[in-house]
């Protein structure tokens, strides 16, 4: 047997986030929507075996695109896709709210995504309770029946009343339960704060405004403050429990139109975060309440009312220290799309190429996961030919104290039949491991994403056709904050 001495490779691990060809650090995420069974499970009432198989198929598919993060919706309507003492299991799982499956969906997602080197961001909707009160039946144990005064109905939907402190306290406690009990990368919320306005209907929060005005005279300012307060409280809850967990928001793509605010974007959007959803995203970024923002830019490049390029540049210029990822509307791709720009995946490819030329932008999130499954080669070939050809690590959070990972130890490469078995032991703070592969005799460049072979939470990896005679394998570790350790080489036996 040939034995090589393990050598600590004292090389600077650099990121190349601005490289058009293959950035080593880049967010590549997909939303996994559970509301209305958009992505998972495909319908209520499947067997545990069927639901698990569907989840694993989704993750395998996303991993095949070299995505590195999933944003899993675990609380679409004041319900739970995890073990909760506060809210009932979602009716979109079993068909009946309060009836849980025989496994923990969030834990399975964390375990299976981790094996494939992907992080899990946990996606919650803060206020929504029922999308349609005429169709959705609440569990008898739902908070609604204990505290009906905390809720209101707008259109066909039911919501927590954002105006009450008790609402903020409860939603924050839900976040605390998740952060304490699960090893997640981030807490994530989207654009649904106050609901999108219904023409001719006023949101019925007058009683809350009268009861808890907090010295506000203007209701719109009060509403924005309600959302500010819950964002700040959620941030504080995360820090009190696990300060290394990130908090991200994916808002509607337009903060304000320039016609209303000189700081706004050159857009003519029919709704905006600030004026309609009462979500003052820029304030949250400036106050360090959130770690990243992912504006939903679901318009094409050149769209007259909300141009993707204009908005990407606007958000890049308004990051205020938070990471900025761009939300892409992959769901719009169709050969029968009304807008010709969406009749192929070229639009998504062009958007990715465009934002890679904006150094303030740190990657992408794609809506939604099922598009990677259903669109097949329509999406796969354009992305895998170039943009996502190589694996990328997720960016480090700018606002969280970085945790140092120690290099793995006892890294051994063993040939077994036609395969290679790589094994190692985790060091302190190690959450994931990055396997590199280099041709012998060439410079071992750890800054080049082309040399990343695999990422996983496991401490063992089978490598088909390892070709140990011509390749060197090495390994580093990633901490919770995605901070990379020094690498070491595998000893070949």
Question: Predicted regions span which residues?
Answer:
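Aromatic-lined carbohydrate-binding/catalytic grooves of carbohydrate-active enzymes
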Residues: 63-101
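Beta-strand-rich modules
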Residues: 463-484
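Pro/Thr/Ser/Gly-rich low-complexity, intrinsically disordered linker/stalk tracts
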Residues: 379, 383-429, 482-493
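Active-site neighborhood of glycoside hydrolase catalytic domains
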Residues: 166-174, 180-189, 193-267, 271-292, ...
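Aromatic- and acidic-residue-enriched segments that line the glycan-binding/catalytic groove
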Residues: 80-94, 128-154, 191-214, 259-271
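Catalytic domains of carbohydrate-active enzymes, especially glycoside hydrolases
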Residues: 53-79, 181-185, 283
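Active-site-adjacent "subsite" loops/lids of carbohydrate-active enzymes
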Residues: 33-52, 122, 127-181, 275-279
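Substrate-binding cleft of secreted/luminal carbohydrate-active enzymes
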Residues: 278-304, 320-399
């Amino acid at each position: 047997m040939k034995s090589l001495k393990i050598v600590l490779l004292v090389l600077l691990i650099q990121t190349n986030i601005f490289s058009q060809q293959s950035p080593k650090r880049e967010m590549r995420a997909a939303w996994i929507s559970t509301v209305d069974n958009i992505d998972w499970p495909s319908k209520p009432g499947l067997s545990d075996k069927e639901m698990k198989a569907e989840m694993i198929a989704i993750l395998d598919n996303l991993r095949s695109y070299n995505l590195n993060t999933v944003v899993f919706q675990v609380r679409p309507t004041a319900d739970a896709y995890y073990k909760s003492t506060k809210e009932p299991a979602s009716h979109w799982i079993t068909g009946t709210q309060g009836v849980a499956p025989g496994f923990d969906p969030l834990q399975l997602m964390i375990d299976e995504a981790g094996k494939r080197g992907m992080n899990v961001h946990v996606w919650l909707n803060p206020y929504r309770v029922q999308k349609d009160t005429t169709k959705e039946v609440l569990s008898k144990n739902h908070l609604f029946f204990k505290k009906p005064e905390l809720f209101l109905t707008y259109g066909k939907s039911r919501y927590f009343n954002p105006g009450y402190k008790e609402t903020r306290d409860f939603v924050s406690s839900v976040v605390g339960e998740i952060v304490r009990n699960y090893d997640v990368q981030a807490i994530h919320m989207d654009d649904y704060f106050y609901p999108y306005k219904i023409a001719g209907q006023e949101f019925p929060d007058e009683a809350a405004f009268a009861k808890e005005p907090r010295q506000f005279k203007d209701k719109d300012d009060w509403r924005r403050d309600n959302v500010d307060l819950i964002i700040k409280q959620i941030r504080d809850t995360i820090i009190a429990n696990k300060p290394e967990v990130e908090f991200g928001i994916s808002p509607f793509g337009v903060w304000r139109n320039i016609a209303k605010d000189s700081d706004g974007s050159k857009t003519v959007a029919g709704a905006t975060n600030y004026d309609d959803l009462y979500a003052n995203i820029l304030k949250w970024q400036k106050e360090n309440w959130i770690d990243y923002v992912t504006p939903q830019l679901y318009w094409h490049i050149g769209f007259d009312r909300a141009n993707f390029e204009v908005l990407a540049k606007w958000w890049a210029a308004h990051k205020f220290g938070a990471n900025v990822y761009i939300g892409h509307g992959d769901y719009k791709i169709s050969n029968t799309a009304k807008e010709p720009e969406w009749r192929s995946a070229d639009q998504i490819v062009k958007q990715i190429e465009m934002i890679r030329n904006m150094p303030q932008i740190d990657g992408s999130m794609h809506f939604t996961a099922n598009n990677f499954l259903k669109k097949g080669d329509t999406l796969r070939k354009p992305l895998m030919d170039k943009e996502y050809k190589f694996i990328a690590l997720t960016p480090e959070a700018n606002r969280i104290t970085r945790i140092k990972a120690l290099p793995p130890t006892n890294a051994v490469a063993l040939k077994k039949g036609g395969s290679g078995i790589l094994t190692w032991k985790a060091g302190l703070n190690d959450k994931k491991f990055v396997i590199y592969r280099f041709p012998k005799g060439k410079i071992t460049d750890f800054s080049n994403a082309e040399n990343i072979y695999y990422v996983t939470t496991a401490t063992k990896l089978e490598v088909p056709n390892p070709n140990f005679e011509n390749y060197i394998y090495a390994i580093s570790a990633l901490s919770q904050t995605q901070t990379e350790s020094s690498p070491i080489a595998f000893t070949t036996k």
